[in-house]
């Protein structure tokens, strides 16, 4: 008799996935400090040496706590890596896209809004290029990291789609969702290129920021 196929689990909401932090509900400030010290230590080590070369003893030593303390909060280094990845993506979303409302694109303000948002995005990626490169590499071989990256892309694109729909007439941008996807992809790929993910970039960050901002502004607000 053939066995029944297991039902697929319901899809996880991308925003819920990104915000599903593993941080415990601390009752003592000392415990909270130890937890955050482990996060910081792991971030530094993964940035410097990559995922494979780092072990839990090194993370605990760098954080100034025992290995037993590490396992009090995390099952293994993979779990702390996922938490770092999640925190980084949430921070990027909050610092760039989450606060963008239609009112910030009224008249000449849109010019500065676009440039400021690009500057913040580039700063976020370039302040720790090794870590962002690690996230990219891991997303190609780790399903959970890939899932987080897809969730970040989905949430960002959804937000941009709503924004474009609100500020740009449909006769100018007939497909807000596709346009949002292209703008998101262009901005992220440009930032990753400047971070050296595929070698030294051929142009500097200032020129790239200006060109990307002009490209986005022309796409959304063409001179008619």
Predicted stretch roles:
Residues 133, 146, 167-214:
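Hydrophobic/aromatic-rich alpha-helical bundle segments in the mid-to-C-terminal region
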Residues 86-92:
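Short, basic, alpha-helical segments at the C-terminal edge of helix-turn-helix-like DNA-binding modules
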Residues 102-107, 127, 142-143, 153-180, ...:
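Hydrophobic alpha-helical bundle segments that form small-molecule/ligand-binding pockets
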Residues 111-116, 127-158:
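Short secondary-structure transition hinges
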Residues 38-46, 121, 187:
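Short hydrophobic clusters on alpha-helical segments that form packing/core surfaces
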Residues 1-33, 171, 224:
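N-terminal intrinsically disordered/low-complexity leader segments
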Residues 83, 97-126, 183, 209:
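Hydrophobic alpha-helical connector segments
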Residues 33, 37, 45-79, 83:
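Helix-turn-helix
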């Amino acid at each position: 008799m053939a066995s029944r196929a297991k039902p697929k689990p319901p899809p996880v909401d991308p925003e819920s996935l990104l915000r599903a932090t593993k941080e415990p509900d601390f009752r003592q400030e000392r415990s909270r400090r130890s937890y955050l010290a482990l996060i910081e230590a792991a971030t530094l080590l993964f940035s410097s040496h990559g995922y494979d070369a780092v072990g839990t003893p090194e993370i605990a030593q760098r954080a100034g706590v025992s290995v037993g303390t590490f396992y009090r909060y995390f099952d293994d280094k993979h779990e702390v890596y996922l938490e770092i990845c999640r925190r980084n993506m949430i921070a990027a979303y909050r610092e760039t896209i989450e606060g963008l409302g239609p009112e910030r694109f009224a008249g000449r303000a849109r010019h500065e809004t676009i440039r400021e948002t690009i500057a913040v995005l580039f700063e976020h990626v370039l302040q720790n290029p090794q870590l962002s490169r690690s996230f990219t590499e891991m997303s190609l071989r780790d399903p959970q990291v890939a899932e987080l990256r897809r969730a970040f892309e989905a949430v960002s694109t959804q937000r941009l789609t709503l924004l474009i729909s609100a500020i740009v007439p449909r006769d100018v941008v007939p497909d807000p969702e596709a346009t949002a996807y292209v703008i998101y992809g262009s901005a992220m790929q440009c930032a990753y290129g400047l971070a050296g993910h595929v070698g030294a970039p051929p142009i500097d960050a200032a020129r790239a920021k200006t060109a990307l901002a002009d490209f986005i502004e022309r796409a959304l607000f063409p001179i008619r």
